[in-house]
Amino acid sequence: MWTLVVNCGSSSLKFALLNPATGETPLTGLAERLGSDLAAVRVDRGEERGTVPLPQGSYSEAFGVLLAELDALGLRQEVRAVGHRVVHGGDRFNAPVRITPEVLEVIRTCIPLAPLHNPANLAGIEAALAAFPELPQVAVFDTAFHQSMPPVAYRYAVPTVWYTCYGVRRYGFHGISHAYVAEEAARLLARDLTDLSLVTAHLGNGCSVTAVQGGRSLDTSMGLTPLEGLVMGTRSGDVDPGLPDYLAREAGLTLAEITAALNRESGLLGLSGLTNDMRELEAAAAGGNTNAQLALEIFVYRLAKTIAGMATVLGRLDALVFTGGIGENSATVRAATLARLGLLGFQLDAAANAQAVRGQGGVITSGGVPALVVNTNEERMIARETARAVKGAPA
């Protein structure tokens, strides 16, 4: 069964045609700058690549290109379902669901929780429904994996009315990635996922750590929004909640300006004053740039502290999993993090760690608790979850 996976951003549309069982992917594409005169879609057909301009710059136009590509490959009639990444499902969804008018309405009610993402997700779903009206379509939520967290993990110590009336609680994100790498780690370790206690670290421009026990999320570092938790590429992570009030009084900044700075001008970029790219930071740090060195030290310090905290949540730790652009490719960050986590029993294999880059995963420890590098594949996880939802739901 071929499954079409769709991931819509505020000005982009990413798609992939996958076999959920094998991971075979004969077609991928990325439409960017939607809504502008420069909109175009890059298409990858394996050995062939091309770019198609989108004069209207719309989601529906991008889907038109997708349909033409499927026809060219002779696979349009072979697509059995469409899976959509949806960033926020609030507390209404703890698993992927077949898309219905009722599901669409719930996604709309979650727009205040994800004002940049959910509207784009809805636009993509509506375009896909128009392009593939005969196919089952499934919403796979980034927040659903974390709905297994207990109240002790997801409630904030704020007035209860904020929770009951406004949904103020911790939701967590990167759930699709955390779920995928947990499954893959169990496979690599030849262990039953239901018997494993894992800490998974998704480290990219956005970063989060999750405690996974028996395949279920017990706690995670992101919260109501993706701003909470670790130091990230341009996001601050945890700061004193009194910071906005202080900056409003002392610097005359508005709430919108402070929020924008915490999301787009902070993290590794803010600390270093150079870049949010870990590769460039590592090079600058190696060249003696003290700001870059400090940014790396703070990133690793906060990461190690959070991993140790998640291990405490689990009660025992069977393995630590690194994934995401930084987690999969920065041997420096992995080594520095494990060096701070000696009390958990990690014994780094320096050679294996150095080799685990550019798509080469595997175990990077020589003894004690295993640490692994697992290449995330959110598209394949969405395809898997879509196939499960279609198989398990009535037509």
Curated annotation (Swiss-Prot):
EC number assigned by the record: 2.7.2.1
Enzyme class, first EC level, given as a word: transferase
Residues where substrate binds: R85
Entry's cofactor comment: Mg(2+). Can also accept Mn(2+).
Metabolic or biological pathway: Metabolic intermediate biosynthesis; acetyl-CoA biosynthesis; acetyl-CoA from acetate: step 1/2
Cofactor(s) this protein requires: Mg(2+); Mn(2+)
Name the record gives this protein: Acetate kinase
Organism: Deinococcus geothermalis (strain DSM 11300 / CIP 105573 / AG-3a)
Phylogenetic placement of the source organism: Bacteria, Thermotogati, Deinococcota, Deinococci, Deinococcales
Gene: ackA
